[in-house]
């Protein structure tokens, strides 16, 4: 038996993702919004991490992704980058471009993408939309920033789409999604997210593209899958879309743990001796002196209150 430790896993690049598609190896991607989550998912072995604008709903409590700002995406992306570095450093990091950061002009889009890379530590950016964003994608790619596309259900267009509904169910809309997929590949996207489209359509799109497809609510035929971390952990028992499989019941575990903590505090069972500090050299102020000091004028406060 060899005594040599196993070789460290290679960092996943855009080229490695293409190789995975070509070899038939499935790509596992999840979202993360902070350093702790990023470290945990990295150690768990994910291939890619998405700092999604879904943080607007999963973290900030909004009803949609629309209120999320570019500054917030930069902030969360930088946190995730630090967390991945504390994991195994292997996962590929993609960050969403927020609503309004790329729709107005290609110039603004390039500047926003460069911020996400330079300040947020992203290796690539993801933007939503079809062929109409082809020139924006070309400009960003020419600036040196890889772009992941996103078609099908695009949450930033929720009002235009009339809600969070499956896309491409009829022949005409399915053909448009296929045309958009080809156009985004031609514009320079290195991968595409396919969200909430029929499994049959996702299979056709995947088979006709050279770049990897990452599905969410798009069936088993994509080259990879992505889920929102909060959803797969079961943090919100009230949110159960059909395409989400809950791989844990972390929400219930959190409630149980915090409930146990509250109970022990109320019962004066925590902290106990094992969770307290001790010293044999502490000098106590006599009770009488302490009482006299209480009657004296209190000194000026030093430092900030807590």
From Swiss-Prot:
Pathway: Cofactor biosynthesis; (R)-pantothenate biosynthesis; (R)-pantoate from 3-methyl-2-oxobutanoate: step 1/2
Positions in coiled-coil regions: none
Family matches, as InterPro entries: Pantoate_hydroxy_MeTrfase, Pyrv/PenolPyrv_kinase-like_dom, Pyrv_kinase-like_dom_sf
Swiss-Prot/TrEMBL catalytic activity: 3-methyl-2-oxobutanoate + (6R)-5,10-methylene-5,6,7,8-tetrahydrofolate + H2O = 2-dehydropantoate + (6S)-5,6,7,8-tetrahydrofolate
Molecular function GO labels: 3-methyl-2-oxobutanoate hydroxymethyltransferase activity; magnesium ion binding
Gene3D superfamilies: Phosphoenolpyruvate-binding domains (3.20.20.60)
UniProt GO cellular component terms: cytoplasm
PANTHER family, per the entry: 3-METHYL-2-OXOBUTANOATE HYDROXYMETHYLTRANSFERASE
Family indicated by similarity: Belongs to the PanB family.
Name recorded for this polypeptide: 3-methyl-2-oxobutanoate hydroxymethyltransferase
Taxonomic source organism: Anaeromyxobacter sp. (strain K)
Taxon lineage: Bacteria, Pseudomonadati, Myxococcota, Myxococcia, Myxococcales
